[in-house]
C-alpha cells in the first residue's frame, strides 16, 4: 500500500492530513507549512492530536494582528520578554552600521527596532538568507538612555529631549526550519515509487487527494504544473482558469518561499526597487511572484512597469535609476476566464482582458509557457487530502533547494535535439519547462541514462512544447509578426533514441 511505502521511505517527513473534516485548522486560517509543522509537533503515530493542546499552542505562539497592542504593552510597559512565531525582515543602516528588523504582519517597522550586536552575531546567518524569514522571535525593550540629552533653550527656556529613543529589541531568534533537507535522500527515495505513485504523492504534499481526480492523469499533471516555478529559477508562466480551482490557495498558502499579490496596485518600486527607501522589492526575496486576479491589478505607471518587466523577465536583471539588481524569482500571471474562451481551448484571444501592460507581444514572448487552468477541476471535498502525506513545509523546502541544482538542466541540454535556426526564446522556454518537470517528477535522474526516452518525452518534452505552443499562438493573435510561426520541432537526441 502506498501509505505504508511513503511512511517507510520518508518517516519523519510524513504527517496525517485530513482537510475534509479538519474544520479546527480551517478556523485557525494557517498556511499549509505552518499547519503541517504543528501537526508534526502534536500528532501521535496514528495521526491523532489533542485539539486543546494545539489550540493553546496557537494562542500562545501565533498571535493575530489584533493582538499586537497587547504584545506591545507586555514588551514596552510591563518590560516582559515575549516569544512568538512571526515573519521577520532585517535592515542594515549603511551610515551607522546599526541593524534593525521589522515584523511586516504586525506593522512593526525598522525605525522602532534594534538588533544589538551580540544578538546579531548569534542569529545573522538565519536572518540574511532571505528577504523575509519565518521563525520564533523573542522580543524585549531597550529603554531610552536617560543620560543622552540635548537641550534646546527657547524664549521660555523649555528643554526638549532629543536623544536615543526607546526601541523594541530582538532578544533571540530561532529559524522556522524543522527539517534538514537532505536532497540526496529525497532523490534516492524517488526510486522506490512508480511514476503514477509519485504523482499521487506530490498531490498529497500540497494538500490534494489524488483519488479525487478519478484516475485522470492530465488533470493531475495540470495541477502539478503550477509547482514548476517553485522548483525552477525564473520560470515565467501565465494561467487562466475558472473560479474556484485553487489558484490562490496553491500559490499563496502552501509555500513560504513565494508571494501572492491579489488585486490592488502594483508599482515598480514594490516589485523591483524602492529608490526613496533604498530597499529591494518582491523579486529579490522570493522564489516566485504570483499576480493573482491579474485583471483587477492596476499599475502606477504602465510604460515604466512594462519596461522593467521586459528587462527582468529576459535576463533576471532590473535597473531602477542608478541601481542595478539581479534576482531569480519567477513570475506567474493568474486570471479568471470566461466559458466561451475556455471552450476555444486556447485558440481565441485569451489575453484581451489582461491589464494594458501585458498587451504587448514583446512582453508576452518572455513568458515561457501557458497553463490551461480549465483542465483543473473545481475544488470539492473529494479533492481535499485525507490520509498520510508528505509534510508541506518539508516538500516546499526541497523544491526551494532543487532550484540551485543545475544537473537537471545538463540532462535536458544533452537529451533534447535543437533544430537549426530555432528561435532562442522558444528553445530556452522549452528547456526551462522540461527541466522543471524533470526535477518535479524524476528527481532521481542524475544523467540521461537514468530516465527512459519514452518517459522523458511524455512527461517533460511534450508537455513543455504544448505549454510554449499556446504562448506562441497567442502571440500571433496579438501581433501579425508572429502569425504562422510555430515553435521548432524539438526532438530527442538520436544517441538516446537508440
Language model segments and positions:
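Conserved NTP phosphate-binding and transfer environment spanning the P-loop NTPase/kinase superfamily
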Residues: 60, 363-364, 368-498
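Conserved ASCE/P-loop NTPase catalytic core
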Residues: 211-343, 347-349, 365, 488-493
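Conserved P-loop NTPase catalytic core
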Residues: 339-357, 381-389
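Extended, charged/polar low-complexity intrinsically disordered regions
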Residues: 1-209
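Long, well-ordered mid-to-C-terminal structural blocks that present hydrophobic/aromatic surfaces
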Residues: 325, 330-334, 350-380
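Short amphipathic alpha-helical segments and their helix-coil junctions
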Residues: 197-215, 404-421
Amino acid at each position: 500500500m502506498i501509505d505504508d511505502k511513503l511512511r517507510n521511505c520518508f518517516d519523519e517527513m510524513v504527517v496525517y492530513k485530513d482537510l475534509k473534516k479538519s474544520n479546527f485548522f480551517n478556523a485557525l486560517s494557517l498556511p499549509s507549512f505552518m499547519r503541517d509543522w504543528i501537526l508534526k509537533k502534536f500528532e501521535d503515530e496514528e495521526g491523532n492530536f489533542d485539539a486543546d493542546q494545539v489550540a493553546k499552542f496557537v494562542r500562545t505562539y501565533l498571535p493575530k494582528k489584533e493582538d499586537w497592542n497587547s504584545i506591545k504593552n507586555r514588551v514596552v510597559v510591563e518590560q516582559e520578554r515575549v516569544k512568538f512565531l512571526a515573519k521577520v525582515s532585517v535592515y542594515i543602516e549603511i551610515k551607522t552600521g546599526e541593524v534593525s528588523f521589522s515584523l511586516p504582519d504586525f506593522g512593526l517597522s525598522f525605525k522602532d527596532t534594534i538588533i544589538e550586536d551580540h544578538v546579531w552575531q548569534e542569529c545573522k546567518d538565519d536572518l540574511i538568507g532571505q528577504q523575509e524569514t519565518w521563525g520564533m522571535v523573542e522580543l524585549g525593550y531597550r529603554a531610552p538612555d536617560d543620560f543622552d540629552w540635548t537641550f534646546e533653550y527657547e524664549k521660555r527656556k523649555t528643554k526638549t529631549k532629543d536623544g536615543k529613543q526607546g526601541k523594541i529589541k530582538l532578544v533571540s531568534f530561532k529559524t522556522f526550519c524543522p527539517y534538514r533537507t537532505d536532497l540526496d535522500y529525497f532523490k534516492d527515495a524517488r526510486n522506490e515509487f512508480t511514476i503514477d505513485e509519485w504523482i499521487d504523492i506530490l498531490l498529497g504534499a500540497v494538500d490534494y487527494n489524488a483519488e479525487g481526480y478519478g484516475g485522470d492523469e492530465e488533470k493531475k499533471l495540470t495541477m502539478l504544473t503550477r509547482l514548476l516555478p517553485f522548483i525552477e529559477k525564473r520560470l515565467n508562466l501565465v494561467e487562466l482558469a475558472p473560479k474556484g480551482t485553487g489558484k490562490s490557495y496553491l500559490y499563496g498558502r502552501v509555500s513560504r518561499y513565494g508571494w501572492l499579490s491579489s488585486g490592488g496596485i502594483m508599482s515598480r518600486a514594490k516589485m523591483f526597487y524602492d529608490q526613496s527607501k533604498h530597499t529591494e522589492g518582491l523579486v529579490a526575496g522570493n522564489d516566485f511572484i504570483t499576480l493573482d486576479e491579474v485583471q483587477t491589478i492596476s499599475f502606477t505607471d504602465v510604460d515604466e512597469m512594462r519596461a522593467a518587466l521586459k528587462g527582468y523577465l529576459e535576463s533576471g536583471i532590473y535597473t531602477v535609476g542608478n541601481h542595478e539588481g539581479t534576482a531569480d524569482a519567477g513570475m506567474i500571471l493568474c486570471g479568471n476566464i470566461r466559458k466561451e474562451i475556455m471552450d476555444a481551448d486556447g485558440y481565441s484571444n485569451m489575453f484581451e482582458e489582461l491589464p494594458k501592460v501585458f498587451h504587448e507581444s514583446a512582453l508576452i514572448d518572455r513568458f515561457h509557457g501557458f497553463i490551461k487552468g480549465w483542465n483543473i477541476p473545481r475544488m470539492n471535498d473529494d479533492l481535499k487530502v485525507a490520509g498520510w502525506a508528505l509534510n508541506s513545509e518539508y516538500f516546499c523546502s526541497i523544491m526551494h533547494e532543487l532550484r540551485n541544482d543545475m544537473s537537471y538542466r545538463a540532462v535536458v541540454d544533452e537529451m533534447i535535439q535543437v533544430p537549426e535556426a530555432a528561435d532562442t526564446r522558444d528553445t530556452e522556454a522549452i528547456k526551462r519547462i522540461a527541466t522543471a518537470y524533470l526535477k518535479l517528477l524524476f528527481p532521481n535522474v542524475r544523467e540521461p541514462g537514468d530516465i527512459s526516452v519514452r518517459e522523458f518525452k511524455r512527461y517533460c518534452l511534450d508537455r513543455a512544447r504544448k505549454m510554449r505552443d499556446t504562448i506562441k499562438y497567442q502571440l500571433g493573435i496579438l501581433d501579425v509578426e508572429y502569425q504562422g510561426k510555430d515553435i521548432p520541432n524539438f526532438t530527442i537526441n538520436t544517441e538516446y533514441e537508440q
